[in-house]
Amino acid sequence: MTAPNSTPASSRKRVRRRRQDKPALSAKLVLDAHVKGDVGVIATDLFADLFPHLWANGDSQDTVHVAIAPWAPSQTPEANNWSIVPVIRSSTVAPSTVQFSPSSLALQSFATHLQQAAPSKLSGHNKGGIEILILDVSPIELDTVFVNLDGELAKRLEDGEGTFFREHPVNGKGKARADATPEEHLTAALRTALGTLKIVHSGDFFPLPLPPHPVTHQPPNPGRITLCEPVAQGILAPTTKIIVSRVRTSKTKRSSASGQQQGRKLNGVAEDDEDAYFSAAEEDRDSKTNAQTAETDADDTEFEPQAGEDEDNLSDDSLDEIISLQVPTLPTTVTGQSTIGTGTPTMLRGRKTNGPGSVISSYTATTARPDRPRGRLFKAHGLMKPIPPDLLHPKPTPEDDEEACIYVDMRDLTRVGCFSGDWIRVEAASEPPSNGLGAFGLGSFVEQEADEINWRPARVFGLPEGYSSRSATRSHHSRHDSRNSSFFEAQSQKSNPPAYTSPILLANLDNPPYLRLSPIKRPSSSIIKGVAAQSKTSSTLKPPFAREVILQHVRTPTAVERDVQSAVMAGLKHYFERRLRVLRTGDLIAVPIDTQLGKALQESTIPGEDSAIDEVLGLIAATRPGQSLHYDDVAWFRVGHVQAMKQDTTEAVDGEEAEDLWGGIACVDISLTHLEQSGSVTGRIPGTISNSWQYYLGIRKLPKHQQNPGLPAQLQTLEPEKQYVSSLRRKLRELMAAATSKPALHLNLPPLAILLVSTQRHIGKAATAMQACSDIGLHTFAIDAYDIVNDGGGGGGSDVKTAGFLTSRAERAMSCGPESCVLLVRHIEALTADRMVSSIKEILADARVLIATTTEVEKVPDGIRALFTHELEMSAPDEQEREGILSSILADRGIGLDHGVDLSGIALKTAALVAGDLVDVVDRALVAQRSRLEKLTAKATGSITFRDVQLAGGPAASGLTKQDFELAVDAARKNFADSIGAPKIPNVTWDDVGGLGNVKDAITETIQLPLERPELFAKGMKKRSGILFYGPPGTGKTLLAKAIATEYSLNFFSVKGPELLNMYIGESEANVRRVFQRARDARPCVVFFDELDSVAPKRGNQGDSGGVMDRIVSQLLAELDGMSGGEGGGGGVFVIGATNRPDLLDPALLRPGRFDKMLYLGVSDTHDKQVTIMEALTRKFTLHPTVSLRSVAERLPFTYTGADFYALCSDAMLKAVTRQATLVDTKIRELNAAAGPEGKQISTAYFFDHYATKEDISVMVTEQDFLDAHRELVPSVSAGELEHYEQVRAMFEGAKDKDKKKEGAGGDGNGVDGLESGNRNGMLAITMGDDGAGAESTKKDGKGKGKAADNEVNGAGEGKGKEGVSPFQESGGDEDEGLYD
């Protein structure tokens, strides 16, 4: 809505606020050619109801905006697709009417929604109007509009060919300058063209300001709006960005594309764009072809009885199944058992082409049956939500039972042989054979007993428009439309038409995969009366009323609680009061209840006032259904006995025929029927794996794609998409199904006891067990062991009380049936008393399935643990499991997603998070979405409300976006790091690490490759998951480890040596195990051992009394061996060690499979590398333009480590800050001196608020600051220490280069040159040593002079070397071969 720009100054009336909870109004949309332009006309009464705050202004003709949607029973903004259109009020319009021009561009979006919801309303001009829902709305200014434009037309607009004609303005608005650039020409033309749309909708077409073709006068192809941000529809603002995407249109499509804009009108022409729609009239012409598609085999085919023919003359042989083989020509005699030829005279039963012995038909097993199944075969589908009766025709009465109805497509009613609203026979059927034998399958000639057929009468209705699925592709038309085009097409498996019904009705029919629908069998007296009797029997007659009905309560864990009995009785009373229920003996009745409200009312009322509670609950359910009551459970009842009244009909000859006609069902009228509840029974309920009763009864929310009414053929009718099922849930389901099966009960097999173990909490053990029970229809009675221990109390005899409480609750669970109820004990580690072993044994003696969960399995007593037959471990979910869990959470809550959201990417970012953490991620994403929408409403101009954003629609407004999930994942990962004790990693990236190019490449090969390409390691190749950084202190070993964790989005564990030590025997090794277990739970992650030489020194050299360090090293070796395989839970865990004394490490740590990747981190040996490090450290500094880092680096020695460079840059920045502060203080003193002693003295804060310039605020580091810091800096590592580290490096790397052939360089040289040439790939290492000898000789002292030999260590160059290499280095020397070449 656009409020008036001017308000009279004299008007001091208080502005009325718009209601956000206003329900939508029903109105009619009339297309009137007399209405000109794109703005509609709204009736005065609608204007007064929608805009009461503007109604008081009098005769205001300002344009306002309303949101319209095709009429639907649900009037909430979230459940409909709304289109915002501009209107003005008029007193000449009929009440409750909105008029638009048939060619209005504003109705393009509404036409799309109407086509999906009710296509027939687009097929012709509806003079009575189109029923719509209408709401007031304020449009939002759009930030970005994405436009698709033909490339040639865009080029013409860039050339300035745009002319403004017809609906385009003729003034100069929007025209570009004469000297404008091509981009300005295009921008001006598009902004003018989009200006013709009063409201911009996603998917709208708009005319371009180009002249038509000079010869054909055909207008150019219109532009198309592909996307609007931040909402799907709004107004174009001057600040709106227009992004053009140029597409190429083929010549064959240009003619049709030019008429797309005119096709998207509501004047009787359906839109004809790339999403082609075919109306019912087109499909009627292909009804025979569509009938072929729906056939499965000859068993499922039946023709309608013709005039003068009895229904016994019907045959399953159909003309639709005739095979057309034209070439080569076959004899006219068709294969089959019949010997009657083409010259056979007319048979006794009349001229037929589909009977036995026909010249066209084959002799089949179906025709050989004495009493073949009658009716049409349909695929059974349970409804996700009841179909509103207002959409059905004929409209059912309010008392009709919706659970006794079946819905099929309108075109399938004729094949059943009935009309919409007739009573039919519904028979449970099995799946038809899929092999080539067809009706000749095994057992096809065996006659089935009539008593074995599970059937019942039900009313059939045609699916409302928009619900039925219709093919969107044209069928191939051949010359012989009634014949199959080939033999192989006739033999192919074809789908049956769907039939939708209540999942409760399907459960009472034993959940059959198929239903056979046929007209209800007429009594013998009705056959004489003919068609009139058939019509009367099918539609007019009703089942007999019940005289007495006995109900038995199905015991479930929730329904047996005393606190919810009042809610159960109130729900049962309401169930029979609002409908005439159709029941028969053995039926299940599902009564949804609100247990929370029932318990609250039970606690707040006086004992004995149960009748008042029933009345309150019944009144709430009757007056505000679905708004105040939030159903969270279902009470189940079974019909024990139904006694029907004698039916006074003329059709029935005797009682047996009447009973056979209705199959034992009866209508329950609470005013006539004696309803009695007698006792209770135990048994299973329908399993959710094959029944959708949880969605149908409102216990679970519908998935978002099911709640979208813009989806034809799938609007609350189809079953939900297949959700992710974990392997553990599937295994639990199989074990419980086997333990509770009839053979297991008959053979009295031992009970099933399962212990679910995990190392993390909130991983979903109990939820997985409950879901597995619900899948197969078992009840779950959950017990928390800590609650039992608390109820037992302290003091003497607490164990006896605890055991008593456990036994009593187990007995209550067994009252629901041992074969149909599972006892779930959570946190079983709390039951540590010895008496619990005997108590659990007693429970297992009566129960069939016992499931216990624990996160601390070592605390479970051995006696209790030995009672379990299965022990299953639930580990942290991997990437695919996390994606499945996320999709399940979103589906259960009915949350939609933006098109840009990729759940697999979110699953990758949520590594190490379990199910409970993923629920928290979704909750945080919802909070982020709410905050984003609130910011959008606050940012928008005018009176924009939160409901306006919802009405504007779009995936970003109605669902979660990628930004919402990013905020949620970041917050969840921070909380997860706190929960597992992982340190917070600073935001260290590769940019913060200067140089070390070869080290980065080696790290990428070790870590990134297994993460991004796991298929390379799928054939048994072991991953190299251990990296050892060694070198002088301050060279960036810890910084590099943090950068690895940040760059690859890994969790980071930092382990110090003293953290692992413990005074108790065995605890130090246990600490090592816990570290790696936490790493496996948090994978992918990095375990960083800083100062590894203190954690794992050489074994046998320590003087500790108990050999603690030796045991720690042994445990560390055992854990490292499990990391490289990846199959045993170690995949995704990378171990990084850092030390400056690798010679002190235990040699076993450096063998293959452990720390086999050794990377030396040294100092910079060239000024170029020093400049690279300084650039990384000063990338956030503001350097003076005259600063040259190279000139600074040339004055620095080669002994500076990374830490020294960090200190150098930090000191330089500090000196710059000090210098700038001194200058500011000098200016303040000068100002105070100029003001004099009597003037106002200014402070530092006042100076920065009023006098400071940009130069005073900015701090720029000069080259002199670096030089001053260099003079004061003392290197952290001396030249002698660097020489020692270089010797250590040569000792470790010498074995790797020993067998390589190098071209040595002769001559003498100093140690610096030799080390520089011996360094590999720019490794940051240099030794400022004395002039030394040349290449390594074979002497023991390692010194000598001469040319480098092929087998020498240091390769080309001269320097000091060392001959002795320990055996362990030679064994693992080839692992890093070629790394430093």
Swiss-Prot record:
Cellular component, GO, one term: peroxisomal membrane
Acidic residues: bias regions: 270-284, 296-315, 1372-1381
Compositional bias (Basic residues): 11-20
Protein location: Cytoplasm, Cytosol; Peroxisome membrane
Positions bound to ATP: G1031, P1032, P1033, G1034, T1035, G1036, K1037, T1038
Coiled coil: none
The keyword DNA damage belongs to this UniProt entry's keyword annotation: no
GO biological process assignments: protein import into peroxisome matrix; protein unfolding
Basic and acidic residues bias (residue ranges): 1294-1305, 1337-1350
Biased composition (Polar residues): 1-10, 333-345, 355-367, 487-499
Positions of the UniProt region annotated as Disordered: 1-23, 247-315, 333-374, 467-499, 1294-1381
Reaction(s) catalysed by this chain's protein: ATP + H2O = ADP + phosphate + H(+)
EC number(s) per entry: 3.6.4.-
InterPro entries for the chain: AAA+_ATPase, AAA_ATPase_domain, ATPase_AAA_core, ATPase_AAA_CS, P-loop_NTPase, PEX6_4th_dom, RecA-like_PEX6_r2
Keywords (A to Z) from UniProt: ATP-binding, Cytoplasm, Hydrolase, Membrane, Nucleotide-binding, Peroxisome, Peroxisome biogenesis
Gene3D superfamilies xref list: 1.10.8.60, P-loop containing nucleotide triphosphate hydrolases
GO molecular function annotations of the record: ATP binding; ATP hydrolysis activity
Membrane topology: Peripheral membrane protein
Biological function: Component of the PEX1-PEX6 AAA ATPase complex, a protein dislocase complex that mediates the ATP-dependent extraction of the PEX5 receptor from peroxisomal membranes, an essential step for PEX5 recycling. Specifically recognizes PEX5 monoubiquitinated at 'Cys-6', and pulls it out of the peroxisome lumen through the PEX2-PEX10-PEX12 retrotranslocation channel. Extraction by the PEX1-PEX6 AAA ATPase complex is accompanied by unfolding of the TPR repeats and release of bound cargo from PEX5.
PANTHER family tied to this protein: AAA-FAMILY ATPASE, PEROXISOMAL ATPASE PEX6
Protein family per UniProt: Belongs to the AAA ATPase family.
Quaternary context: Interacts with PEX1; forming the PEX1-PEX6 AAA ATPase complex, which is composed of a heterohexamer formed by a trimer of PEX1-PEX6 dimers.
Protein name according to UniProt: Peroxisomal ATPase PEX6
Organism: Neurospora crassa (strain ATCC 24698 / 74-OR23-1A / CBS 708.71 / DSM 1257 / FGSC 987)
Gene behind the chain: pex-6
